[in-house]
């Protein structure tokens, strides 16, 4: 191999076929594209991870509110399936951990962290799908529960019509509050689904954008230390470079 002089920072690619040094006086479109992709990923992942954490906190808070609601004969069965599934708690914790790990991975991108973030976001997509289905079923069950509540109030004898009117208002109020809680939880879950899909796609691009092989950066040396020699070992598939 002919010795080469490194006049600027050079990227040496070590592959099974040997080491190759690109020409320093020519632009490196692939590396420029890779750097641009990484900057784009960092900017987007930070924002999406922050929104993902906020939506998860919203789902968790609404789940705690539902769990603390006193038992009701007609409406408890509507959200009991949602609470028993554990989605407002387990799913929200999954989203929070996924968002935090995305921020950590954006700061320190290693293959293990990237693969872990990709896996967690794929699992978050599954949890979000499950949450959307359960919340939609709960929303659909509000109207029958409200009708049963109104019928029970009408059948109950009251001395004054005024008190019966107040009892009917309790049914409407319970339906309105639960509809608001379910709607907020559904919107947050749909946002989580979209963010998890986008983040998983970004991490997938990140994990597949690296070139196989080791990358070695050769810094610019002084004028006195500008000679480079190459030593080829007996194995032709291995090359070693020494900076003298």
Swiss-Prot record:
The gene is Ms4a6b. Residues 68-84, 143-176 are extracellular. It is found in: Membrane. InterPro entries: CD20-like (IPR007237), MS4A (IPR030417). Expressed at high levels in thymus, spleen, and peripheral lymph nodes, with less abundant levels in non-lymphoid tissues. Its main location: membrane. It is a multi-pass membrane protein. Belongs to the MS4A family. It comes from Mus musculus. This is Membrane-spanning 4-domains subfamily A member 6B. May be involved in signal transduction as a component of a multimeric receptor complex. Pfam families: CD20. Keywords: Membrane, Receptor, Transmembrane, Transmembrane helix. GO terms for cellular component: membrane. Residues 1-46, 106-121, 198-244 are cytoplasmic. The chain crosses the membrane at residues 47-67, 85-105, 122-142, 177-197.
């Amino acid at each position: 191999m002919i010795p080469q002089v490194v006049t600027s920072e050079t990227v040496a690619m070590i592959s099974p076929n040997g080491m190759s040094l690109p020409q320093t006086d020519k632009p490196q479109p692939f590396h420029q594209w890779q750097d641009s992709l990484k900057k784009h990923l960092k900017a987007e992942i930070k924002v999406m991870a922050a929104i993902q954490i906020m939506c998860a906190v919203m789902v968790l808070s609404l789940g705690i509110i539902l769990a603390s609601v006193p038992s009701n004969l007609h409406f408890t069965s509507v959200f009991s399936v949602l609470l028993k599934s554990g989605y407002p708690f387990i799913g929200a914790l999954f989203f929070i951990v996924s968002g935090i790990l995305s921020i950590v991975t954006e700061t320190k991108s290693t293959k293990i962290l990237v693969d872990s973030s990709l896996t967690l976001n794929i699992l978050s997509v599954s949890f979000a799908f499950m949450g959307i289905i359960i919340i939609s079923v709960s929303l659909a069950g509000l109207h029958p529960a409200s009708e049963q509540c109104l019928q029970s109030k009408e059948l109950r004898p009251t001395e004054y019509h005024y008190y019966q009117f107040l009892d009917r208002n309790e049914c409407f109020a319970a339906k309105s509050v639960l509809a608001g809680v379910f709607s907020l939880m559904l919107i947050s879950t749909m946002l989580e689904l979209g963010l998890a899909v986008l983040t998983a796609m970004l991490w997938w691009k990140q994990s597949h954008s690296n070139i196989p092989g080791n990358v070695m950066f050769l810094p610019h040396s002084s004028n006195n230390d500008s000679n480079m020699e190459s030593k080829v070992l007996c194995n032709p598939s291995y090359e070693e470079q020494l900076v003298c």
